[in-house]
Amino acid sequence: MSTSVVRHARRIVVKVGSSLVTADGRGLDHAALSRWAEQIAALAEQGKEVVLVSSGAIAEGIARLGWKKRPKAVNELQAAAAVGQMGLVQAYESIFRTHKLHAAQVLLTHEDLADRTRYLNARSTLRTLLELRVVPIINENDTVATDEIRLGDNDTLGALVTNLIEADCLVILTDQAGLYTADPRKVADASLVMEAHAGDPELERMAGGAGSSVGTGGMLTKILAAKRAARSGAHTVICSGREPRVLLRLAEGEPIGSQLVARQAPLAARRQWLADHLQLRGGLVLDDGAVRALQEDGKSLLPVGVRGVTGEFERGEVVAVVDASGREIARGLTNYSAAEARRIAGKPSTAIEAELGYMDEPELIHRDNLVVLA
């Protein structure tokens, strides 16, 4: 591996495990949080957009409640998460403000990202936060997400967020140096995997299942997260969060840990996802000007360029975009239902609120959710 993929990444999702943000599981390690915030602020100064998926809420809640060990009952874990999330967010906001940045709390469940409408809402919110130079602090909504507490895989959440915002890479920071050919705690001659293709079945065999006592994620969840992130063309780096200035060194191109590369470029992966894996629910017929705006200028699709709406679809579903002759030129996730689209078709975006009584987005399809096919 000659250089880290983080060097050329513009948008990065960083997942920090429990052992890297807590004091041996006894509440938050504020010095550690300060180090992460300092590095993320430095990346922001370089023009990089960073989303932080941070563990630590349950561990902080356990400490605040005075419990001596992590409970097993789900309702007690949920209570600890609710208490600890307050401290986690307060700590991050306070620290980031010293770097003249704001933090934002975003609590998600896997179900939020499986539902198309909620997916678009989450995507729009995160995109806006990044445009405002706010650092989103993401965690699972443990208070309601029973299954997620039992699985405990913020690694998977990190991958889902990577897909959601089309990040260039996912950095999973752990208490191990990276992925080894075998569990180094059990096999003396196990060697570090410097680079491999995400999704290689051999990686899952290597992963084993060792995890720390503070969190609940082992190396296998990280391998599966890298595989998921690769679906949108994102590379993954799994490395030790104990390395000094690890994020900055990765951004400088230093190869640290295990780099799991995606086989497809982001655009190709996005094209395949939209073109092959989602059922079309309807269509939008465009005028010639809108066709040119999409094909030649890479613009978002505005309602003013729509001359007709076919089929029945809801917000967040996939529709075909066709020219006047019926030739499909693009596919995308629509911001409005078919009924809404018919009411605003041919009208400027400034008229959406007057027509519908609200305006979710100024575009019918944002260019980030649009793939031009011809």
Swiss-Prot record:
PROSITE patterns cross-referenced by the UniProt entry: GLUTAMATE_5_KINASE (PS00902), PUA (PS50890)
Pathway annotation: Amino-acid biosynthesis; L-proline biosynthesis; L-glutamate 5-semialdehyde from L-glutamate: step 1/2
EC number(s) from the headed UniProt entry: 2.7.2.11
GO MF annotation terms: ATP binding; glutamate 5-kinase activity; RNA binding
Family matches, as Pfam families: AA_kinase (PF00696), PUA (PF01472)
Gene label: proB
Binding-site list for substrate: S55, D142, N154
Catalyzed reaction equations: L-glutamate + ATP = L-glutamyl 5-phosphate + ADP
Alphabetical list of PANTHER family matching this protein: GLUTAMATE 5-KINASE (PTHR43654), ISOPENTENYL PHOSPHATE KINASE (PTHR43654:SF1)
GO CC, one annotated term: cytosol
Residues involved in ATP binding: K15, T174, D175, T216, G217, G218, M219, L220, T221, K222
GO process annotations (BP): L-proline biosynthetic process
UniProt-annotated location(s): Cytoplasm
Recorded family membership: Belongs to the glutamate 5-kinase family.
Protein name: Glutamate 5-kinase
Functional description taken from the UniProt entry: Catalyzes the transfer of a phosphate group to glutamate to form L-glutamate 5-phosphate.
Keywords associated with the record: Amino-acid biosynthesis, ATP-binding, Cytoplasm, Kinase, Nucleotide-binding, Proline biosynthesis, Transferase
Domain PUA: 281-359
InterPro entries cross-referenced by the UniProt entry: AceGlu_kinase-like_sf, Asp/Glu/Uridylate_kinase, G5K_ProB, Glu/AcGlu_kinase, Glu_5kinase, Glu_5kinase/COase_Synthase, Glutamate_5-kinase_CS, PUA
Source species: Thiobacillus denitrificans (strain ATCC 25259 / T1)
